[in-house]
Regions:
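Hydrophobic alpha-helical transmembrane segments
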Residues: 1-6
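Exposed, interaction-prone extracellular/peripheral surfaces
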Residues: 155, 186, 190-371
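An amphipathic, basic-hydrophobic helix/alpha-beta surface used to engage anionic
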Residues: 10-269
Length: 371
């Protein structure tokens, strides 16, 4: 019996030392996002990969990491604890020379840039009576785009913008350069209907002429709250309106630019996107909107518009097409300084468009403010 006890002690000591010295050798873990980009409301996977590239098995090990609490795990999840962040703790058991990969489904519940920075492997020892930790860095991130506001809610503002573009087109298009015919739209003038085409096809068609100015719309996005405290739901809905309106206008072939006092999460600079069109430009706008960090101090919006107006005045003297820009303001804050600056920058517009976002009981809506 004594010899058996001595043998047990010797085996215990040997295994304890062997595992203590070698448990994390050729043992690695990685946690990453399945996508580089997503849109708010999308479901993605968090991928956990653990590799044991040695003969010594690791029968029980915990892999721990933290992630922003906006990522929602499934209702049946029991391996996460939510406080300031979501803390994840998963148990792995690996044989010799084994790789284990798990995919955990999560929902992206808010816009932003999110990063995984570190992972811990925690080993309780060969006999579950010790705690050994191996930390390593992670380099995975995801950009979650804002969910565009519903197209139906943007119908009125779209008609106002297209009406302003048509008004300017008639002031600038060359009636001697016929470009073709197209389907009639609600904002088209009766004088441009091609009656011969209507008689032939039975569908209303309008003449289309070459224009001497571009179709440019600039969205001015103010993220200053009107109240003393940050109305985060209203600010986020304003960003969604900017995304939805950009998507709608770009789909109609309009060049869209965007200027905001919302600052980039890394550069800390105001958000500014020059005019462009197409899917790649919409993705650029989405990326810029996703990168806005509303916790940072913001430039006063009235001052931003005043500086922009001075810049546009100088460009107009230089003959730049920027002088033909149509401005659309998205701002819940309606103080007198903003009103004055808005009146100046939209002085040449027949339709002065100011969208005021609001949120009631979690549901976003908007109305239009007079300038």
């Amino acid at each position: 019996i004594v010899l058996m006890l001595i043998g047990v002690v010797v085996v215990y000591k040997i295994l304890s030392v062997v595992y203590k010295e070698n448990w994390d050798k050729n043992l690695s873990s990685d946690v990453s996002f399945s996508n580089k980009t997503a849109t708010k409301g999308d479901k993605i996977d968090i991928i956990e990969t653990v590799v044991n590239a040695k003969k010594l098995p690791v029968f029980c090990m915990n892999v721990k990491f933290d992630i922003d609490r906006s990522f929602i795990f499934g209702q049946n999840d029991t391996n996460s604890m939510v406080s300031d962040k979501t803390y994840r703790n998963d148990v792995f058991s690996l044989l010799s020379n084994q790789k284990v990969t798990r995919r955990i489904a999560v929902e992206c519940s808010r816009r932003g840039v999110f990063r995984l920075s570190a992972v811990e492997m925690v080993f309780p020892g060969a006999f579950m009576n010790e705690i050994m930790i191996h930390r390593s860095r992670l380099y995975s991130d995801i950009t979650v785009f804002p969910k565009p506001a519903d197209v139906k809610s943007l119908t009125d503002v779209n008609n106002m913008i297209m009406g302003e573009l048509e008004r300017r087109k008639y002031l600038s298009e060359d009636k001697f350069v016929f470009a073709g015919i197209r389907d009639y739209q609600s904002y088209d003038s009766v004088r441009d209907i091609n009656w011969k085409a209507y008689a032939r096809t039975g569908n209303l068609m309008v003449n289309h002429y070459n224009e001497t100015v571009s179709r440019n719309v600039c969205l001015l996005l103010n993220l200053e709250s009107e109240a003393a405290y940050m109305q985060e739901d209203v600010v986020e809905y304003a960003i969604s309106i900017a995304a939805g309106l950009s998507q709608l206008l770009i789909a109609r072939g309009v060049n869209v630019s965007l200027i905001s006092n919302g600052r980039d999460i890394d550069t800390k600079q105001n958000t500014r996107i020059e005019a462009g069109s197409g899917l790649s430009h919409f993705n650029q706008i989405n990326t810029k909107l996703a990168r806005i960090d509303i916790s940072q101090d913001m430039e006063e919006f009235a001052q931003l518009m005043t500086s922009l107006n001075e810049e546009c005045t100088m460009m107009a003297y230089a003959g730049s097409s920027r002088s033909d820009m149509i401005y659309v303001i998205i701002s819940a804050n309606k103080n007198d300084r903003i009103r004055k600056a808005a009146g100046s920058i939209m002085n040449n517009q027949n339709n002065k468009i100011w969208i005021v976002p609001r949120v009631n009981s979690g549901i976003g809506s908007m109305y239009y403010e007079n300038v």
